[in-house]
Amino acid sequence: MPKMKTHRGAAKRFKKTKNKIKRGSAFRSHILTKKSPKTKRHLRAPHYVSKVDEPRVIELISTY
């Protein structure tokens, strides 16, 4: 059986912490002028993968 390979796209997007998986925030790349400062400030906060999606993400980055 061949080696399990890390999904490189997922490896760049997710970081594994002690007990959660950190992810980037959506809606932050462009068209920021119409967004309020409060919205942009909240988007800077850390975001985590939901418990339901964690097994799928772990499968993609398991060898990483």
From Swiss-Prot:
It comes from the Bacteria. The keyword Transcription does not apply. GO terms for biological process: translation. Pfam families: Ribosomal_L35p. GO terms for cellular component: cytosolic large ribosomal subunit. Residues 1-23 are annotated as: Disordered. Keywords: Ribonucleoprotein, Ribosomal protein. Belongs to the bacterial ribosomal protein bL35 family. HAMAP family: Ribosomal_bL35. This is Large ribosomal subunit protein bL35. It comes from Nitratiruptor sp. (strain SB155-2).
